[in-house]
């Protein structure tokens, strides 16, 4: 069983005790009379993963506590129509991804002209579907693990934020509801210990060393139609990523040789969410095409349906089913797909303390790509247990 | 007969028009900080505030939503279209993605009224029988 390092456990425990009875706090303008109020919020999550077969998201066949997240943010409104906000973040998924490095999750200045138009610049969360910009916020959903074919916990460093900016706003459509938009562009910053780097290393032969991961340029738009039916919204997202890839050093008999791989990516995603009474009903479809300079391409996709019901203030539960295909031309090969049926139980023990337990039955090994070589064939299915607790203020 | 039908129709129209003019929230009234210029809001405008589509008052003061958990859930659902749990999750998503600020909360009606009175740009739904000291009532149309 893999445990986090002990210094971190002590630090996190002290933080938990301090946060346990805390509410979000604010530096009042009466303390610093010329300063607008600054709001602080944060969260701390610790999870446990255990799988019956195959190590997935860590050394999980022996049980793994290397599944943690912590965020701390501050925001203020220094001028009319203006907001400044920033969040520091640390996480770990397994022994190779994240490693509790603390990074700048987002930091932006935002100016809202009116309801129809605003601009946000800096390091901004990338809008994509229901969960991309909040996939590491355990509080914001019923489940422990989001559908991994679409929201891979190991790849957050690549997918969650861009350095650039976005325009946003909402247009009323009279009796047809309203249309919200976010259009963004910027540069991604894959971390040296992030999921993308780990995946690329796992794909390289023994004589090839990964030197760097490219910081690709990305641009896209997310639209949400807030329909006239209260609680129902329908979304669509399109994005283009240019210059993804890596730099490598290849050890040859005549000495080291530099290598490089680049490719472009098209992504689109459709989403439907319906909040009806105590139900939260969601479904999404995701499609990605990676194209190399030679013209070769790989198309992958994923979809899920989910339902969650809040029984009372402290208990919510719900199942989801998801499928992922690494290569849409190989839908029959369990090496290239991963199908997952999950049931999640969420307990809101306090307004600041959430506990979740979740079971998965998984068929296929299409997402084990970076943890095991060669990827094993699965024709019978396997189980995974996920447990997580989160404190917030 | 025709004139009676016409009179009944006109009466229904008047009653319907009267209902449209003022929307009563279930067990709650909307209050705001005295510095807020608006004296009334449409139901759509109120929903836009509670669903983060409108973030600033005219003049640029940021809107600060304050809530009283458990006591005004029905009125909150009328205003936002979400139950209390969905509302909390909605704003947590915004707060932890850099797109908004979580609503402030108070433990009782008096504390909520005091919070709104002392916070520029604040708006809240309080129980209908709460004492509204230092705040202004917002009519919902």
Segments predicted by a language model, with ranges:
Chain B
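Bacterial N-terminal signal peptides that target proteins for export
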Residues: 1-9
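Flexible loop/hinge segments at secondary-structure junctions
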Residues: 23-141
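Bacterial N-terminal signal peptides
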Residues: 9-18
């Amino acid at each position: 069983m893999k445990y986090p390092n002990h210094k971190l456990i002590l630090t996190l425990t002290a933080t938990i005790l301090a946060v346990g009875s805390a509410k979000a706090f604010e530096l009042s303008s009466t303390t610093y009379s010329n300063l607008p109020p600054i709001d602080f919020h944060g969260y701390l999550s610790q999870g446990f993963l255990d799988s019956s077969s195959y190590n997935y998201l860590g050394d999980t066949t022996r049980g793994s506590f290397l599944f943690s997240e912590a965020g701390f943010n501050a925001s203020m409104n220094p001028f009319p129509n203006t907001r400044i906000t920033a969040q520091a973040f640390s996480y770990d998924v397994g022994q190779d991804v994240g490693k509790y490095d603390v990074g700048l999750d987002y930091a932006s200045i935002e100016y809202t002209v009116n309801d129809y138009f605003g601009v946000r610049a800096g390091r901004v969360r990338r809008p994509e579907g229901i969960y991309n910009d909040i996939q590491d916020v355990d509080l914001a959903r019923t489940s422990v693990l989001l559908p991994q074919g679409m929201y891979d916990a190991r790849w957050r460093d690549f997918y969650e934020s861009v350095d650039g900016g976005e325009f946003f706003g909402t247009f009323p459509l009279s009796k047809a509801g309203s249309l919200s938009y976010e259009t963004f562009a910027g540069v991604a910053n894959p971390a040296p210990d992030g999921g993308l780097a780990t995946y690329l290393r796992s794909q390289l032969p023994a004589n090839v060393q990964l030197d760097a991961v490219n910081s690709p340029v990305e641009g896209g738009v997310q639209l949400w139609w807030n329909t006239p039916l209260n609680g129902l919204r329908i979304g669509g997202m399109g994005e283009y990523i240019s210059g993804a890839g890596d730099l490598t050093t290849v050890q040859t008999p005549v000495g080291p040789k530099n290598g490089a791989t680049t490719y472009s990516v098209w992504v689109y995603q459709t989403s439907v969410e319906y909040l009806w009474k105590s139900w939260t009903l969601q479904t999404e479809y995701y499609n990605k095409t990676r194209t190399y300079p030679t013209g070769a391409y790989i198309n992958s996709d994923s979809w899920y349906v989910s339902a969650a019901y809040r029984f009372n203030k402290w208990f919510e539960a719900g199942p989801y089913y998801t499928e992922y295909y690494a290569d849409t031309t190989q839908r029959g090969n369990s090496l290239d797909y991963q199908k997952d049926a999950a049931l999640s139980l969420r307990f809101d023990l306090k307004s600041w303390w959430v506990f979740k337990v979740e079971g998965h039955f998984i068929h296929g090994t299409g997402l084990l790509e970076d943890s095991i070589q060669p990827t094993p064939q699965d024709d019978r299915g396997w189980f995974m247990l996920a447990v997580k607790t989160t404190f917030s203020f | 007969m025709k004139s009676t039908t016409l009179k009944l129709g006109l009466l229904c129209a008047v009653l319907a028009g009267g209902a449209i003019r003022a929307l009563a929230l279930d067990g709650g009234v909307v209050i705001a900080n005295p510095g807020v210029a608006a004296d009334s809001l449409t139901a759509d405008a109120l929903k836009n505030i509670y669903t983060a589509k409108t973030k600033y008052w005219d003049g640029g003061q940021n809107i600060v939503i304050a809530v009283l958990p458990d006591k005004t859930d029905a009125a909150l659902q009328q205003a936002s279209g979400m139950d209390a749990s969905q509302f909390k999750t909605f704003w947590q998503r915004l707060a932890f993605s850099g797109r908004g600020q979580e609503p402030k909360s108070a433990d009782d009606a008096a504390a909520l009224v005091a919070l709104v009175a002392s916070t520029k740009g604040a708006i809240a739904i309080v129980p209908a029988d709460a004492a509204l000291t230092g705040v202004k009532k917002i009519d919902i149309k």
